[in-house]
Amino acid sequence: MLDVCLLGSGGMMPLPYRWLTSLMTRFNGSSLLIDCGEGTQIAIKEKGWSFKPIDVICFTHYHGDHISGLPGLLLTMGNADRKEPLTLIGPKGLERVVTALRVIAPELPFEIKFIEITQPEQTFELNGYRLKAFRVNHNVVCYGYTIEIDRAGKFDLERALSQEIPKQYWKHLQKGETIESDGKTYTPEMVLGAPRKGLKLTYCTDTRPTNSIRE
């Protein structure tokens, strides 16, 4: 299941009931944040979500209303004694911009990994889903993002029974795992039907009309 929370949709300045641009997703126990405008931390708390599972933060571009909340979020993560590395993804210049913002957050107990987007389109494999970055038409270099999640076929009970596959292996095969036991190999394809239609979420902020969104 993919959970989606639009934390903010405002521009330029935060309003009492409309925080600056930010979107958060949850999948397979990890969270992804796209943009981190001023007040994003408060919006996360208001929605009852948590910053702790965030392992990837993406930026569409580097205008202040899309990134100014990052230093405070990094400090909060550090104060919570985070040890897991954090991956940041954004247009070229990401490391330079974040390094400048970290003047007020110079020491953190976790590693920050930078991935800079250098092509009009780039795809990343992250925690069981694909993240596609695509260039849009803004007055600075700006990207939208698409999350794609493949879905395996449904478990076929009759096939499992007809092939005499031990019941204790069913849940592992459903997860896509291959089991070897007593000289036999059991694969997910033996018990799963045709792949189901996947999930797709596209997020785009500042842009003029562009075909890259439709594609």
Go through each PLM region and give its residues.
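Conserved beta-strand hairpin/beta-sheet module of binuclear metal-dependent hydrolase folds
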Residues: 1-47, 83-85, 145-147, 194-203
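Conserved beta-strand segments of alpha/beta enzyme cores
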Residues: 3, 87, 111-113, 130
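Conserved beta-strand termini and adjacent loop/short-helix elements that scaffold enzyme active sites
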Residues: 7, 91, 115-120, 134-136
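Active-site metal-binding loops of divalent metal-dependent hydrolases
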Residues: 9-11, 39, 62, 93, ...
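Active-site-proximal loop/helix segment associated with metal-binding centers of metalloenzymes
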Residues: 15, 129-214
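Short acidic-hydrophobic surface loop/beta-edge motif
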Residues: 25, 121-126, 179
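Active-site metal-binding motif and surrounding structural segment of the metallo-beta-lactamase
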Residues: 38-89, 113-118
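A gly/proline- and charged-residue-enriched helix-loop-helix capping module
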Residues: 96-103, 114-119
